A protein has these predicted regions:
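Hydrophobic alpha-helical transmembrane segments of polytopic
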Residues: 39-42, 77-81, 140-143, 147, ...
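Short, amphipathic, aromatic/basic-enriched membrane-interface segments that mark the entry/exit
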Residues: 31-36, 104-112, 171-173, 224-234
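Alpha-helical transmembrane segments of polytopic integral membrane proteins
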Residues: 48-51, 83, 87, 121, ...
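C-terminal ends of transmembrane helices
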Residues: 92-103, 149-167, 217-226, 272-273
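Acidic (Asp/Glu-rich) catalytic motifs at the cytosolic membrane interface
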Residues: 67, 79-123, 153-159
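Topogenic membrane-insertion module of multi-pass membrane proteins
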Residues: 1-89, 271, 297
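Helix-coil boundary and interhelical linker segments in multi-pass alpha-helical membrane proteins
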Residues: 49-79, 121-142, 185-204, 251-255
């Protein structure tokens, strides 16, 4: 996410009021710059609120939540992080739409992501399950939070590099932080959906959290949704599928989230295979451009 690099005076050359988004607020900040940063700050607030709900849930009853409304505190904790992910997905796009990118917005976004998708899921899962295995459980939570922060630091360090093989081919490096947070909650989704205490087993949750942490900092190529270009012949079918998924999220949200997680995990090997195919094609084109080796005298 990036924010307002171009600040306007709020007036055109003739002194008349210009774009309302360019009106300068007290302190020199423009409304254009404020909007995407406010969305990022809201995402951070949602992530922190998820921790608050988890603390409340851990201090009260620990039974399986009932279905429907009102939501249980464990459900609210997960939902808060998911909403943070939704806001994280739109703040950068809004910044680009408003032409409000800057270094400040990028740094704010990374700091917010490290808390909302690193610290918050780690603490929520620790309070829900891993505290029953105090030492190893805490190490698993710690590893997840640290790997999320390291992934974001790696992304920031590479952002200005010209040579990014994964990015230039339309792929990501490792699992993105918001997706990693959503995947980390898979045992919690299953517990809410089925009521089976086996999914709350701290050893199982700890191993799962360690696996997702590894995927976040790994160098494997993962599919970038923004680079997917469906063929015209299947676009209507894709719209129908998306509509069905949306309806399923409203009627059976937890089972639908389980399905989305499994679908994404099934696509990880496909991303690795697709990138390997792209690498082979690039190597073949480079070899063809270089021409045959010179003949020996």
């Amino acid at each position: 996410m990036t924010d307002g690099g171009r600040e306007g005076s709020g007036q055109d050359r003739r002194g008349r009021p210009g774009n309302p988004a360019d009106v300068r607020l007290p302190g020199g900040l423009t409304l254009r710059a404020l909007i995407p940063n406010a969305i990022t700050a809201s995402a951070l607030a949602f992530g922190l609120t998820g921790i608050r709900f988890a603390i409340t849930a851990a201090g009260g009853h620990s039974g399986v939540p009932t279905s429907g409304l009102p939501l249980d505190d464990w459900q609210k904790a997960v939902l808060a992080v998911i909403l943070a992910g939704v806001l994280d997905g739109i703040d950068g796009r809004i910044a680009r739409l408003l032409k409000a990118q800057s270094r400040f917005g990028a740094e704010l976004d990374s700091l917010a992501d490290s808390i909302s998708f690193g610290v918050a899921p780690a603490l929520i899962l620790f309070l829900w399950s891993l505290q029953n295995l105090p030492r190893l459980g805490w190490f698993a939570s710690l590893a997840f939070a640290l790997c999320c922060v390291l992934r974001l630091a790696r992304f920031n360090a590479r952002i200005d590099l010209a040579d990014q093989p994964h990015k230039s081919a339309g792929f990501l490096t490792g699992v993105p932080a918001p997706v990693g947070a959503g995947l980390a909650f898979l045992p919690l989704y299953l517990w809410i959906a089925t009521g089976r205490e086996e999914f709350r087993e701290p050893v199982l949750v700890g191993l799962w959290l360690a696996l997702i942490a590894f995927l976040m900092i790994s160098n494997i190529a993962t599919t970038s949704w923004t680079s997917i270009r469906p063929r015209r012949s299947v676009r209507l079918e894709l719209l129908v599928i998306l509509a069905i998924v949306g309806a399923a999220l409203l009627t059976e949200p937890w089972l639908t989230l389980v399905g989305i997680c499994l679908f994404y995990l099934a696509g990880v090997p496909y991303g690795v295979w697709s990138y390997a195919k792209v690498k082979r094609q690039r190597a073949a084109r480079a070899a063809a451009a270089a021409g045959p080796p010179p003949a020996e005298a």
